[in-house]
Amino acid sequence: KDSRVRLFENKTNQGYIRNFMSGIVRCDSPYIMLCDQDDIWNWDKVELTLEKMKLMERENPEKPVLVFTDAMNFDSSTGKKLGRFHEMSHLNVKKVDTAHLFMENKCIGCTIMMNRAILPYLRELPEEIRVHDWWLALICSHFGAIGYLPEATLMYRQHEGNQIGGTSYSGYLRKRISKMKEQRQVLFDTYRQGKAFLRVFDSQMTKEQRKTATKFATMADASFFGRRYLALRYGFLKSGLIRNAGLFFLL
């Protein structure tokens, strides 16, 4: 046995979100990285991510900092490289401000590194959290900083259960369009996550942050034209023209 490895077994199935979160809050190291059991890390993944983290910590001392990177998709059955995740998914990783992150997650969880300064913000974990890495990114965008490393630091195993990556972007869009009812529910769940974030962190937000969060949390209650106005006025948008066209159709 390796003394550096500790195994915690949940008494019940908590689901992947709470499974990740319960692991994070148990960490006692200065930095925390997440991984999926079937991904392959590059030999310099930790070194490159830590270098970026140190740079950002100097600019944001004693604040929660999150660094995420790109990943190389590969087919689990053939081993063939399929292309970089963010290029294939057409996600704009430059837009990690709070407004854009309320509407769209940019991070790949298995590429993330965080510092310990994020732990005090994880004392309350509401049921409305959609994805653990999304929640972590929202925290750091509000109270610290987010950095992106364009290098593909791992091989991201593509399998049938993944939403984007191995399939073409056009195939991904066709799938989304064919399930409009489900997409409206996803949008509603995104509003619910924003409302939960406001509820949990209201007292820690600046006046401007609170205003933006409130506008997002109450978008569902606005009129047909009001929802579209709020999206444009406050920047509650997604990546690219096609995604935003779909968003405005659903709003």
Regions found by a protein language model. Name each.
Residues 102, 157-251:
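C-terminal subregions of glycosyltransferases and related glycan-biosynthesis enzymes
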Residues 1-169:
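Nucleotide-sugar donor-binding/catalytic module of glycosyltransferases
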